[in-house]
Amino acid sequence: MSASIDLSSYRDQHFKGSRSEQERSLRDSSTLYVGNLSFYTTEEQIHELFSRCGDVRIIVMGLDKYKKTPCGFCFVEYYTRAEAEAAMRFVNGTRLDDRLIRVDWDAGFVEGRQYGRGKTGGQVRDEYRTDYDAGRGGYGKLLSQKIAPNTDNR
């Protein structure tokens, strides 16, 4: 494998199975995790970009688990491993909606994984962010709650 398609060190802590089963699933998978998306990026934009590398079987958009709105990630599944490898090689680190996107191997989509795992419903990384990122909802969610103006007029 070339460096661009090697497995990263990230492992899904909610994976049902042993570490070696997860490694095997990642090495055989044709599913990719796509991160650092704008909350405004559409499924159509993702399909247009990723279909340049092969036939996309399905795209599952990541959603805020409470609001059911996009929260900056998705899963892209191809029909073959070779197509997914091409996407890892050519799409990882490219720009989509003025954002550098991250592409990583995924062991395969399981129902429920489309929802953010953060306390506020979105992604954990967006809860603690201290910078302002308009494409990902402004300031981090937990920071925004702490600095929200007093609206009860006291």
Curated annotation (Swiss-Prot):
> Which annotated residues bind mRNA?
Y10, Y33, R102, V103, D104, W105, D106, R113, Q114, Y115, G116, R117, Q123, V124
Query: Mind naming one GO cellular-component term on file for this protein?
Result: nucleus
Task: List the protein's name.
Answer: Nuclear cap-binding protein subunit 2
Function, in words: Component of the cap-binding complex (CBC), which binds co-transcriptionally to the 5' cap of pre-mRNAs and is involved in various processes such as pre-mRNA splicing and RNA-mediated gene silencing (RNAi). The CBC complex is involved in miRNA-mediated RNA interference via its interaction with Ars2 and is required for primary microRNAs (miRNAs) processing. Also involved in innate immunity via the short interfering RNAs (siRNAs) processing machinery by restricting the viral RNA production.
Q: How does it assemble?
A: Component of the nuclear cap-binding complex (CBC), a heterodimer composed of Cbp80 and Cbp20 that interacts with m7GpppG-capped RNA. Interacts with Ars2.
Question: Gene encoding this chain?
Answer: Cbp20
Compartments it resides in:
Nucleus
Q: Name one Pfam family in it.
A: RRM_1
